Amino acid sequence: MSQTVVLRVAMTCEGCVGAVKRVLGKMEGVESFDVDIKEQKVTVKGNVQPDAVLQTVTKTGKKTAFWEAEGETAKA
């Protein structure tokens, strides 16, 4: 089932953006993604699990959390 996962990722430069794009490009099930450095926002669409996307982006070393973490417990 296709779904959208939105993350807040601490990115400070194009190198950060490139690292996030690289890991998402290799992730199975990802159909498309958008990385917005100004908003610190990463939107991923595809047949993916939110926790798996969070863990994959966290591997870049960037501080990562679900976009709307209020009321949710994010496990990293």
From Swiss-Prot:
Cellular location(s)? Cytoplasm, Cytosol
Alphabetical list of CDD domains matching this protein: HMA (cd00371)
State where Cu cation binds.
C13, C16
- Give the observed phenotype of the deletion mutant: No visible phenotype under normal growth conditions, but mutant plants have increased sensitivity to excess of copper.
**Gene3D superfamilies given in the database record:** 3.30.70.100
In this UniProt entry, the residues modified to N-acetylserine are S2
Upregulation details from the record are:
Induced by excess of copper (at protein level).
List, for all copies, the residue spans of the domain called HMA. 2-65
Q: State the Pfam families in the record.
A: HMA
Q: Which SUPFAM superfamilies match?
A: HMA, heavy metal-associated domain
Question: What biological-process GO terms show up in the record?
Answer: copper ion transport
The similarity comment for this entry is:
Belongs to the ATX1 family.
Q: How does it assemble?
A: Interacts with HMA5 and RAN1/HMA7.
Question: What is the purpose of this protein?
Answer: Plays an important role in copper homeostasis by conferring tolerance to excess of copper and subclinical copper deficiency during vegetative stage. Can complement the yeast mutants atx1 and sod1.
The name under which this protein is listed is: Copper transport protein ATX1
**Organism, per UniProt?**
Arabidopsis thaliana (Mouse-ear cress)
The record's gene field reads ATX1
